[in-house]
């Protein structure tokens, strides 16, 4: 049986911030737990540059990589919410088809996951929209401009 022992996480924080918040802010990518706080933002800047310039190019032909980058940031703001592709596209000046395709690219590259809605009523379960989530909480924090665990605990997305 697993036990929740806060002492197991104490080595990651200085005690001023709840340890879970620090872990959520850093995310789960390899090497980040030992990285100094001041380098986390640089890590994710490089990660996003590599993701967009190399990984996305190999998955799909996207003519405007800057617009796709804005799409990813907007998608991060919608984490834990129902996604309306029409509104998402309209906010960026792209059509619904492109918004759906780009969302699928984020899913195919393991940045984004859709979780079907749950309801005890099977009809409502089928008719309800799924919610989307960024897979890595550290990347989500970076994309939302959350640059410290202290900022995270007061952010509207905290706890969702």
Enumerate the predicted regions with their spans.
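Amphipathic alpha-helical "lid/sensor" segments that cap RecA-like P-loop NTPase cores
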Residues: 5-49
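Accessory nucleic acid-recognition modules appended to NTPase machines
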Residues: 33-160
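Active-site phosphate/ATP/adenylate-binding loop shared across adenylate-forming ligases
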Residues: 1-3
């Amino acid at each position: 049986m697993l036990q929740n022992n806060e002492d197991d996480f104490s080595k990651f924080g200085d005690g001023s911030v709840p340890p879970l918040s620090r872990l959520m802010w850093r995310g789960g990518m390899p090497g980040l737990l030992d990285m100094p706080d001041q380098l986390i933002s640089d890590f994710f800047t490089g990660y996003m540059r590599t993701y967009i310039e190399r990984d996305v190019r190999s998955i799909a032909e996207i003519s405007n990589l800057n617009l796709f980058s804005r799409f990813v940031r907007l998608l991060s703001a919608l984490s834990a919410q129902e996604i309306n592709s029409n509104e998402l596209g309209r906010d960026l000046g792209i059509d619904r088809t492109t918004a759906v395709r780009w969302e699928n690219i984020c899913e195919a590259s393991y940045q984004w996951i859709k979780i079907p809605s749950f309801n005890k009523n099977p009809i409502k379960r089928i008719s309800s929209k799924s919610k989307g989530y960024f897979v890595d909480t550290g990347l989500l924090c970076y994309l939302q401009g959350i640059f410290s665990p202290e900022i995270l605990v007061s952010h509207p997305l905290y706890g969702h």
